[in-house]
Amino acid sequence: MVDVNRFEYMKIGLASPEKIRSWSFGEVKKPETINYRTLKPEKDGLFCERIFGPTKDWECYCGKYKRIRYKGIICDRCGVEVTKSKVRRERMGHIELAAPVSHIWYFKGIPSRMGLVLDMSPRALEEIIYFASYVVTDPGESTLEKKQLLSEKEYRAYREKFGSSFTAEMGAEAVRKLLRDVELEKEVAGLREDLRMIQGQRRTRAIKRLEVLDAFRNSGNNPEWMVLEVLPVIPPELRPMVQLDGGRFATSDLNDLYRRVINRNNRLKRLLDLGAPNIIVQNEKRMLQEAVDALIDNGRRGRPVTGPGNRPLKSLSHMLKGKQGRFRQNLLGKRVDYSGRSVIVVGPNLKMYQCGLPKEMALELFKPFVMKELVSRGIAPNIKSAKRKIERVQPEIWDVLEEVIREHPVLLNRAPTLHRLGIQAFEPTLVEGRAIRLHPLVCTAYNADFDGDQMAVHVPLSAEAQAEARLLMLAAQNILNPKDGKPVVTPSQDMVLGNYYLTLERENAIGEGKIFSTVNEALIAYQNGYVHFHTRVAIPAGVLKNPTFTEAQNEKLLVTTVGKLIFNEILPTTFPYLNEPSMNNLQEATPDQYFLEKGTDIAAEIKSRPIIEPFKKGFLGNVIAEVFKRFETTETSRMLDRMKNLGFKHSTRAGITVGIADIIVLPDKQEILVEAQDNVDRVMKSYRRGLITEEERYERVVKSWNDAKDEIQSRLMKSLNRLNPIFMMSDSGARGNASNFTQLAGMRGLMAAPSGRIIELPIKSSFREGLTVQEYFISTHGARKGLADTALKTADSGYLTRRLVDVAQDVIIREDDCGTDRGIRVTALREGTEEIENLYDRLVGRTAFEKVVHPETGAVLVSTNELIDEDIARAITDAGIDNVEIRTAFTCNTSHGVCKKCYGRNLATGNDVEVGEAVGIIAAQSIGEPGTQLTMRTFHTGGVAGDDITQGLPRIQELFEARNPKGQAVISEIDGQVIDFTESRDKRELTIQGLSETRTYTIPFGSRLRVQLGEEVKAGQVFTEGSIDPKELLNVKGVSGVQNYLLQEVQKVYRMQGVEIGDKHVEVMVRQMIRRVRVIESGETSLLPGSLVDISTFKEACKEALRAGKALASAKPVLLGITKASLETDSFLSAASFQETTRVLTDAAIKGKSDYLRGLKENVIIGKLVPAGTGMTRYRQIGLEIAGEAPVEADSPVE
């Protein structure tokens, strides 16, 4: 076996017949597999032991030599080598073909490689290879041309005319002869010469031919190797035959395909020996060619060969292709040992870093560790008896198990793993029962709930793996979400409701205005029923010992509620006392207005004050973020556990439930409906009199019902009691929203038909009153659409993530600073007048490209190459600065990655990003994971043409695939002024007067104009509503224009759905789409004109030409969609495992490509550590010193 860590690159090429013979351990001569009586392999057959090795370890076929002591001996009776049976997985055989056969990949692929080398059409080649026409291989003294095709009739005629002075042949032999005659050097030189003169289609064809011929010339592959003389036979263990229960055999399809080839080959040999007539031999040769085609790629040409039940047989190509192929099924994803899965249930009493593992599962997972410990403690004399003890579940093993699992983290994973928080590490604690216990706060990250979800457990084995799990993957470390840097472990549902209820304030609650001397006194008063959580009371500020209080404040009384006193106990001691849900109170100090002088009339003062809002879900998230910012992970995870306990406890105490009596129907609902109906009647009247169009009528009807619903909603919200359970649930952010409530108590409103068009009949009833049959029927459309959408969306979103990961998987932070001389200028993102993303959000965690000074004071707010944190960003926006130039992945010069400075802060940790971080994959996950939350549909706003803007997931796909958008906008190619707009029966035209030229644009009918006569326009500006085609924008505004456009558009879609994603993730993806350039003129470099190359490759070639004083090449940037960009990557392993496996491998083999294993996928495929994180060469030197036999010492999470 090859040691995977020792080689630098992996190369693929065409195999010569000699090479195939050198791999082989013998020729397969017979189609037999195994003997039906003895069930042993037949000699010289497809499973022959002499060729492929013994079926039993250290035992030859005839049984003369058994046992390991005869290792390496070749039996003199049966010729089988005595060795391990494992060699049957690696030893190959071969079949000597009686006639050459063409390889279908090279003849049938698009473009046909054989056709390009020979400059013949694939149709002509097919006729020759499948014995339909003759081809002239040597015209001799005749008037025929070389490579001319002749039918049987013409052949005979020319034979009579010219005799044997010319040679014409058919079949793969003829093609091989032609391939042998190709003079690569001469052809390449000729083509390069031609390229200077020709244009159009001929040029395109010449470029394609040049590419293939040049590839053959440089790679050392010989074109005639595209025709096979010898066929390799893959090892028998890779095409196994197994006995089923009923004595029948199940076999791999490949054996059937090989059998057909051998049968036909043997028949052809016999026919040739007998000297059979030409027509019979030709037919047999054609059948052999078809058999080999079916073996290599069944179904590529003609009807596929079928097995029993008309099922097409799986050929060698199918073994590689698709989700079930070798690449995706076995190389990129393997099943692993030391794993288990079970249903999850909530574990409310766990710490943040713990999970509950069922006893029997833990015992099975940690079996080897327990066995070792049993022996070392002397409880069992040897491993065998230790195993027996475990299998019999003897009581003494439980103590040992507890000892073994302590400090040994396990990984929990929930499918689908959409982002890296879908796998986290926990310390296991043993629990009874058969369900895994999960901490409630990590559910958000896993998107888990307890309605029957299952999770998988994995055990990290090596000391290094355990250390990484503990230091990097522990749930208590993963507080922030990598996509936006906001806490992902915010409390939800019950926990939110409990804390909301606890911090409520109520007017005239029992015991209002009392003064307590200490917190404990207040709690005792509560327990004895003198006050309630919601009661506003006063307490001397000094007794709280809060370091943020001033001297003067400590002397005063603090007005607060009993519930808030309890809530503040969970916060770190150095925090301000939280009395209102405001950022000022959270970050600065408790506002002064809550402190009263001693001796004030407290009760009266409290009565006069308004009620303060309770703490809702969003504010709790801010609290967590602030704690994290100040104290890092350990303190945050402790605080989270306390917040969780408090929430559960008090939502239980509150006993908030929903009853039908909580839904109060609005008394004046009828009036609103009557008014709306009158409105609608008036509209209909106008329509019937022909004052308005059908469109306008429809829009006005829809609008008047929507207004009625909004009116009912706002009145409902006003009329609701603030202590109504349903209101509390929706207001706190625990569950539900205003719209749900309106449907329960107000009216359901308008529904959409399956087409997406809104039905103008409203549902006037609410769920509380009950729907009529017709209303119920209309409702079903929406419900059904919702479910169908969800199912489709999941698949689409998953596929989007897969493409994103593939295109960015080799983007890793590779160096500290790339020294780029460009940045980009960022401003707040706007859509019309609405702000989509403000400047503050865009600056936090980025590196400044230039120093920023305060416009008035001249103070330096941030210097060049300094990281902008929250405080600096706040200072910049407060100073009224509206644009800043920052470093970005767009302009980073690092090849195959990004540098630390251009990337900025790692959002998942809140610190600088480390070298080795796989930012490409994080970006792909951050964009793909919220994909399921995006809508599928195109919004129909009243069915106005041109207003159907694609949004949601389809829009994201359209952007990342760089497709021509639906409803494309017309854009200006020059700066200038709108001087004319004409509209005639068949077209609308807009004229722009530039400095040196005038351009006229045709505006499609039905699209709305966005410019007026006399208006100044810039290049790249839109004239009509709609989306811009990014490829067109690239030609007009260049690379930076299209980068900014894509970033802005992607952000627009996500932000409109309320999803926040850091700009840097989108930047990393867009950078991957625009990494390639198309060579226009090759100058005197080795680049081929018309070829796509990486920017870094192009720069290198130009540098070399400069050094040698040669002519430089010229190129223009190309925008590729993510699928195309993944397939264009330099690594053929990565591309082949993505899509179009056969095409990628065919191409790579001809070019003799080498894969230098730079990305992650390539290394996973060959079984190396990925070159990211601790797998990078620079971190490889770090070893773990294991003292004695103790496990790796890593700080265990503190209680």
Curated annotation (Swiss-Prot):
Keyword Nucleotidyltransferase among UniProt keywords: yes
Q: Which Pfam families match?
A: RNA_pol_Rpb1_1, RNA_pol_Rpb1_2, RNA_pol_Rpb1_3, RNA_pol_Rpb1_4, RNA_pol_Rpb1_5
Q: Where does Zn(2+) 1 bind?
A: 60, 62, 75, 78
Q: Supply one GO BP term.
A: DNA-templated transcription
Q: Which UniProt keywords apply?
A: DNA-directed RNA polymerase, Magnesium, Metal-binding, Nucleotidyltransferase, Transcription, Transferase, Zinc
Q: Does the keyword Zinc apply?
A: yes
**Signal peptide (UniProt feature, chain positions):** none
Residues that coordinate or bind Zn(2+) 2: 818, 892, 899, 902
**Similarity field:** Belongs to the RNA polymerase beta' chain family.
**Official protein name in the record:** DNA-directed RNA polymerase subunit beta'
- The scientific name of the source species is Exiguobacterium sibiricum (strain DSM 17290 / CCUG 55495 / CIP 109462 / JCM 13490 / 255-15)
